[in-house]
A protein has these predicted regions:
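Ligand-site clamp/hinge motif
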Residues: 213, 241-287, 410
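Structural transition elements
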Residues: 340-377
């Protein structure tokens, strides 16, 4: 058949030539008798429950993790942060401490390039920091730059002073700080805030007008995906960057669609989505639904939520009273009710998987007799305390109320929204409150911001013992010495109990039925390894 077709094509060509073609003219190529089927592009359908509010990463009003998930694809960051707090190269292939701990030197990947083909250099990074700290530039989140040499407490660059972001050579980016820093701590805390901008396209632009540039409607980054199009607040289409240094994503397009959170799992089951943010997280109840439809559900490798009982140290002024509250609580029962078997009770704020986790400390076991004895020593007069909670934790609060009553501590519950809860604790309106937070591996992740004059959230009368230890931990660069200081701080907290650590819980992640290579737990750091994703 193939031979016959060849002969027919040759005969047709001769016939056409005989119909008067002039010398030097060439006949058009013969059309294929059976055209190849078009190869359809491979598209990953990605669901997200909240929209991004800007495509310029330093102009996000919300500063939300949902916006960061979009920036993470278009723009590049210095490193990739894993769920356990370890770091992998991204724009920086290596880094080290310098100048006695006052600086960090980043060695950039020479293969990095913006989507317009321009190589990314240290000058782009330095210029990004220079522009974003200009007092005239309406940078949102500028406080993240505070602490660099040559900036004030708001992160604004000070005119006439040396600035702590410089290009030491074309591929060496150096940051210099006002106080000593540990590179890994800095990156764990700040990596998701910093992106390199195509500053070669901002030459001559007035800093006051940077956020108004048309560039941010059709942004150019150096990340693993390229911007294609956007329906603001609804959908964004990205194309894989085949030249991304860490590898080309195993798809052609990534389409991120905003939909109601309640519909994400349903859409995944129906095949309308391949994956959803953040990390395919699912409740224990919905995990059963996912499994019943043949989807695999796996627990995360590290805790993703920390629960605490906030205490007002002004209305609970005696440490013995605060420790009595802890001993009255049945943490195991409370944890089981809240996390449905995915929690671990704790006596510390330090994440149990962190290298700084206390090795021998265990959570206080419930002891109502000891609680009653401490109450007597503290002179508790039977007053009623207010316990604030959100509506989703009303059942948990009721169980706590029962626990405390069994030890003789009176509590009344006030159900409020989250903003009112934190404002009420800050203003000293409530005596206790149930709260949760997203932890990380930093040794000061929870305490550093809560024991300051400006944010004395627990109304501690004397902050100096805490501040002295926090400062010592922050500036100590020797690992064993630092670990000893963290333990000393943790022991002080256990003795004084300005707040009560309750438990850490782990998330469940629905695995994509169509995409492999997803690092689900690390999405909690607002980064996703899309260069490893392959749609099958």
């Amino acid at each position: 058949m193939k031979k016959r077709l060849t002969v027919l094509c040759a005969a047709l060509a001769l016939a056409l030539a005989a119909c008067g073609g002039t010398a030097g003219e060439s006949a058009p190529p013969a059309a294929s008798a059976t055209p190849s089927p078009a190869v359809l592009p491979v598209t990953v359908k990605y669901g997200i429950s909240n929209s991004w509010d800007a495509l310029m990463p330093y102009n996000s009003v919300s500063g939300s993790n949902y916006a960061r998930m979009v920036y993470d694809k278009i723009y590049d960051r210095l490193v990739y942060v894993h769920a356990d707090g370890t770091l992998s190269p991204r724009a920086a292939k290596s880094w080290e401490s310098a100048d006695g701990g006052y600086a960090i030197v980043f060695h950039l990947d020479e293969r990095s390039a913006f989507h317009d083909g321009t190589p990314v250099t240290a000058e782009h990074w330095a210029r990004t920091f220079f522009l974003m700290t200009d007092p005239a530039c309406p940078t949102l989140g500028r406080g993240n730059f505070a602490g660099l040499v040559g900036t004030d407490e708001d992160g604004c660059r000070l005119e006439g002073e040396p600035f702590g972001a410089e290009a030491a050579d074309p591929y060496t980016f150096k940051l210099t700080f006002q106080d000593p820093v540990v590179p890994e701590d800095f990156l764990l805390e700040k990596n998701r805030e910093f992106y390199v901008l195509p500053t070669h396209r901002l030459e001559g632009v007035d800093p006051a007008e940077i956020m108004e540039q048309a560039l941010w409607l059709d942004p150019i980054g150096s990340g693993p995906c390229k911007f294609v199009s956007e329906l603001p607040g609804s959908q964004i289409q990205l194309a894989a960057n085949p030249k991304y240094p860490l590898g080309a994503p195993g798809f052609d397009y990534l389409v991120i669609t905003v939909m109601d959170k309640a519909n994400l799992l349903t859409a995944l089951i129906a095949g309308d989505l391949d994956y959803y943010a953040i990390g395919g997280s699912v409740s224990a109840e919905d995990a059963d639904v996912a499994r019943s439809h043949g989807l695999e559900v796996l627990p995360g490798a590290v805790p993703n939520t920390f629960y605490e009982l906030m205490l007002n140290n002004e209305t609970l002024p005696d440490a013995r009273l605060r420790r009595a509250v802890e001993l009255a609580l049945d943490k195991e029962l409370l944890c089981l009710q809240s996390s449905q078997g995915l929690g671990q009770v704790t006596g510390s704020y330090v994440v149990p998987t962190s290298v700084y986790a206390p090795q021998e400390k265990t959570a206080a076991i419930r002891d109502t007799e000891e609680a009653e004895a401490l109450l007597a020593k503290a002179g508790y007069d039977g007053r009623t305390f207010t316990l604030a909670c959100t509506s989703s934790r009303a059942g948990l609060a009721a169980l706590m109320q029962q626990n405390l009553a069994e030890a003789g501590i009176r509590v009344e519950i006030e159900t409020v929204d989250s903003a009112t809860l934190f404002a009420g604790m800050s203003d000293g309106i409530y005596d206790m409150a149930i709260a949760s937070h997203t932890p990380n591996a930093l040794p000061l992740w929870f305490v550093e911001s809560r024991f300051t004059e400006g944010n004395n959230l627990f109304h501690v009368a004397d902050l100096s013992p805490y501040q002295a230890l926090i400062s010592a931990v922050r500036t100590e660069r020797d690992q064993p010495a630092r670990q000893a200081l963290v333990e000393e701080l943790d022991n002080l907290l256990a003795q004084e109990r300005p707040f009560i650590p309750l438990w850490f819980s782990t998330a469940l992640h629905v695995q994509s039925p169509t995409v492999t290579g997803i690092d689900y737990p690390s999405a909690s750091f607002s980064n996703e390894n899309v260069w490893d994703w392959v749609k099958r």
